[in-house]
Amino acid sequence: MVVPSPPFGPSEPLPEMEPLSKEALRRAALDARKAFVRTLSDAQRARLEQKLAPHLTSLFAGVAVVGGYCPLGSEISPLPATEEARAVGAIVAYPCFSNPAKPFRFLAGDPLEPGPFGIMQPARRHPVVQPDLVLVPLIAVDGEGTRLGRGKGHYDRALAGLKKSGARLIGVGWAMQRLSETIPGDDWDVPLDGFASPDGLELFKRT
């Protein structure tokens, strides 16, 4: 069960204000995430990432392919959990861009070479796979599963196809990234099925 946490962490609450635009909310949430991570020692960060792992592994039963991600900057790492998935026989795949203008694909290989955006990805010789479960990095998420990403649209394009294939989409982040307010949505947004943090796993109900 998720322990409720303030939208931007206990140390840096947002003041009362008019609802922010999506871009302003993105900047505020990203700044808050960076500020939160700066308060953590390496040991504290590692403990929180280990605390996240069982909430993710609880979703692995019957999953043949897990779509993971390489954490960038202040993103929380799912790697302790994906290593457990590999240990029990699941394939762990990572996003790979061959053309920045097209949706990325998941390749069943370790992310060992830099992609076009500086994010490590598998070599293109590895096979393309279809994940059953996708772990999705984010800047923020609300109670409807609306995800706030970096604003480039890469995950939006990829998630649309993955959702149609029946993949389960789970956002992954620090507890303070779960916002109490509603994130402004766009027609192309693909809602997440849940959100996992060190505090727990929340599965979103569809109305």
Description of each model-found segment:
Residues 2-129:
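N-terminal active-site beta-alpha-beta segment that forms phosphate/nucleotide-binding
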Residues 2-25, 31-38, 125, 129-134, ...:
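Surface-exposed, charge/polar-rich loops and edge strands
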Residues 101, 134-138, 151:
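A short beta-strand-loop-alpha-helix capping motif that often carries His-Thr
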Residues 83, 150-156:
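Charged helix-capping and loop-helix junction motifs
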Residues 72-74, 139-143:
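Short glycine-rich anion-binding loops that position phosphate/pyrophosphate groups of nucleotides
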